[in-house]
Structure formats: C-alpha cells, structure tokens
Design a protein with these regions (language model features):
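ATP-dependent carboxylate-amine ligase
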Residues: 1-174
Length: 174
C-alpha cells in the first residue's frame, strides 16, 4: 500500500475530540451559528491561540443581511500560581486585538478579566459555568462565531452541552 493510501486511511474517520477544538454548526430559528468547543483545557497561550483563530474566521452574513458576532465564553484557567489574576487580566488586549465583540465569563479569576474589559465587550459574568449557561444560550444568534474555553475544572463543557441541547440539530461538525 502506498504511503498516501495509508495516510488517507488513517484520517478518513478522524474526528476532533470534544473540548479540543471541535467545531459545530448549530441552528437557531433565524439561522446557523458556529460553536468552537475548546472546553477541555486552558492556559494563557492556548487562550491567545483560540482568540487568534476566532479573529481570523469570518462571521457569515445572515438571511436578514446582518453579520454575526465573535463571542468568547471563558472559564478560569487553573494552576497558574500567584500571578493568576494578572494572567487572566492580561487576556483583555488579546480579546480586543482579535475582534471579539462580546465576552461571557465564569469563575473568580475570570471576574478579574471581566472587570478589566471595556463595557462594550462585557456580556455576563457569573461565579460558575452552570450559572452562566442560560445567559449564553439566550444570547447566541444567527451568524455568530462562539468559542467556549476554560480549564476542565471550570466545567465549561456544561455550556457546550447546553448549546447543543438547545440548538439540537447540528448542521455539521468539522
């Protein structure tokens, strides 16, 4: 078997694991939005990489002629030591630089980041992902590009699960 055939065979059934960058196209009553599930792990470098990815992706035009928003839904980064608050607050510049238009946040360290955001970028902050979940589900709309990211212990997967349940018919996973 040729090397290209071996490579093709290995990749045919590959799926990005949940929480590790899987993208889903979910549908609201007004149209689809893209969900990027990065809920498994987070550190300052991976947060910045996720924001950079979102910043490079276009938000599609909706049937109503408007464009979606870039939304970040963020949970605490754990095990950062005594500089944790500073490292969380430092994310603000990257959010702005990558054209994130609305930020939802959960956890005590993300409160530091949330309070440092310009008011126009502030969505909602809550103490936990479970408390934040209904606000995110209500806020997403057609054309939006939504990234959910946080350390596994911050349980941001709850928000991914809620979005998938509420907007239950994925158009595609990629």
């Amino acid at each position: 078997m040729a090397p290209a055939d071996l490579i093709h065979g290995a990749l045919v059934g590959f799926e990005v694991p949940a929480g590790r960058g899987r993208r889903l196209m979910l549908t609201t009553a007004e149209g689809p939005f893209t969900l990027i599930d990065e809920s498994y792990n987070a550190n300052p470098a991976s947060m910045r990489a996720a924001f950079a990815l979102v910043g490079t992706l276009p938000t599609p035009q909706t049937a109503q002629g408007t464009f979606g928003r870039r939304i970040a839904v963020l949970g605490d980064m754990r095990e950062l030591g005594p500089r944790s608050a500073e490292l969380h607050a430092d994310l603000v510049a990257d959010l702005e630089q990558n054209h994130i238009e609305c930020v939802f946040a959960a956890g005590p360290m993300m409160k530091v980041m949330f309070d440092a955001l310009p008011v126009k970028l502030q969505g909602v902050w809550r103490t936990s992902a479970a408390e934040l979940e209904p606000y995110v589900v209500e806020a997403v709309g057609a054309g939006d590009l939504v990234v959910v990211k946080g350390s596994n212990a911050s349980q941001m997967h709850l928000i991914v699960t809620a979005l998938k349940a509420h907007y239950s018919d994925p158009v595609a996973a990629f």
